[in-house]
A protein has these predicted regions:
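Iron-sulfur-cluster electron-transfer modules
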Residues: 25, 42, 55-233
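Ferredoxin-type iron-sulfur electron-transfer modules and their immediate structural context
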Residues: 1-71
Length: 235
């Protein structure tokens, strides 16, 4: 066979790398249901079916360096429709985890590094966090029926610990009120923690399993410190 610039050398294929991923990508029958269900299909030529086939062929460098895995929203619609039960979101996450950290696009890696260093993706100091949540609590207390409302911080022995999405203390503070009003109306014994309160684990989206373990472990440490048995993770 004559080689062209598009010919793929067998030496470039790494079947072992992707065969080890628990995604059963080699079961693909190329039916295209994943592509028809994908909300991101067609963006920059993205096609989940092609992504699965690339993994099946062992196109390691091509798939790791491609933009496609980062276009995926990981919503899971493709997996839901796949007749072969191929776990495409798991495959995408595994592929993302193979990319060098300094080449991860957008703010994902920077936010993750901030979270590992400070306990939240914003790098928000403890004092600023407390000021923001107490200010939101003060606004709630101005509403009829919530005059006695206060946000419980580091309440030992509470029934429920609620984590917080970083955007709720940044650009969407109004959304905090909905949760807290429900707690108040239900007479729930709840609290938030002043440290490691971050409820968003960006390692989930970058494929960084070690970072996910660290973030989850910190939440567990807070639960042990405050002697709390129940966790609400709104994210």
């Amino acid at each position: 066979m004559n080689q062209t610039e598009n010919t793929i050398s067998m030496e470039k294929l790494n079947h072992v790398r992707f065969r080890a991923l628990p995604c059963s990508h080699d079961f693909c029958i190329t039916c295209g249901l994943c592509s028809s269900a994908c909300p991101a299909s067609g963006i920059d030529g993205f096609d989940p079916r092609t992504l699965v086939r690339m993994a099946g062929l062992g196109l390691e460098n091509e798939i790791i360096n491609a933009r496609w895995p980062w276009i995926c929203t990981m919503c899971g619609k493709c997996e839901h429709l796949c007749p072969m039960d191929i776990r495409i979101p798991d495959l995408v996450r595994s592929i993302r985890g193979l990319r060098e950290k300094n080449k991860i696009p957008g703010i994902l890696q920077k936010g993750l590094e901030a979270a590992l260093k400070t306990g939240n993706n914003l790098g928000l100091p403890k004092e600023d966090f407390i000021y923001i949540v107490e200010d939101v609590a003060g606004e709630i207390a101005e509403e009829p029926g919530f005059e006695d409302f206060k946000v419980p911080i580091d309440k030992k022995g509470a029934n429920l610990l609620s984590t917080i999405h970083n955007k709720l203390v940044n650009t969407h503070t109004e959304d905090l009120k909905y949760w807290w009003k429900i707690f108040h109306a239900a007479k729930e014994d709840w609290t938030i923690t002043s440290e490691n309160w971050e409820g968003t684990s960006w390692g989930l989206f970058t494929g960084d399993d070690e970072a996910v373990k660290i973030m989850a472990g910190r939440i567990m440490e807070q639960m042990k410190r405050l002697e709390i048995k129940n966790l609400l993770w709104p994210e």
